[in-house]
Amino acid sequence: MNPALRQRPLDQSVQAREMEPELSCHAALLSPSSGIVDSHALMTSLLADAEAAGAMLAVATRFSGAVAHDGGWIMRTAGDSEYELECGWIINSAGLFAQSVARATTGYPVRLIPQQWLAKGHYFSLTGRSPFSRLVYPLPSDGGLGVHFTVDLGGQAKFGPDVEWLPIDTPADALDYTVAEERAQAFYDEIRRYWPALLDRSLQPAYTGIRPKLSGPGAHALDFRIDGPKFHGQSGLIHLFGIESPGLTASMAIATRVASIVCAQSIRS
């Protein structure tokens, strides 16, 4: 790695304030390589690459089940019409719906499907000028990264996410993505821990996201799970569980890992 991009501690708050005068802290860790990406443009680019390689995206199409067949799978889908598709591999990267897809895979042991907890995270945007030129992350809170500062490619400053644990029996297809405006006061309190100059009435509701987690409130945070044939014993099947918000950052590494599993089985067979 380029030495200029390595993380380095800022042992005194004065060093951090020289870089970010609005920041209040005791110490900080500088990460020069951290940044932002246009997630929509990234996905559009990846889709174009996939389609150029022969893939097809089928939207508004629900996975309704799969059965093992002749070393591969017959997958059933439902939408305007029902279809059956014969395939060599099923890679379940359905996010919030990954457990539902696994349960609809005939013969897959239910005991191997991990419990899922859903954590809703709110974001509020800032009216006015951005106070920082870098991303700012406070110490993590239970279940999340803490209410951190970020900015989009248009320069809009945002804060979030918080953590709102949803009832464990909430169906993934009945989730509410509205921003709860009454949570704003907690945002003011959290943000003022590292930006005391935040003015009242300067936050506006932005958006929410819901994270599929493999550990619940107060529990030790668990990592992603990539369960392939070596784990569950079924050929041509990979389940990705608990791929929550860091999954976008790790998406290319996850894809490389999944591809290595597919290639390893293909070589053996």
Kindly label every feature range from the protein language model.
Residues 49, 100, 104, 257, ...:
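Active-site catalytic microenvironments for nucleophilic, acid-base chemistry
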Residues 220-269:
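C-terminal lid/capping helical subdomain adjacent to the catalytic/cofactor pocket in oxidative enzymes
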Residues 1-53, 58-59, 65-76, 218:
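Flavin (FAD/FMN) cofactor-binding and adjacent substrate-gating region
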Residues 78-83:
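A structured beta-alpha segment of the ubiquitous adenosine-cofactor-binding alpha/beta core
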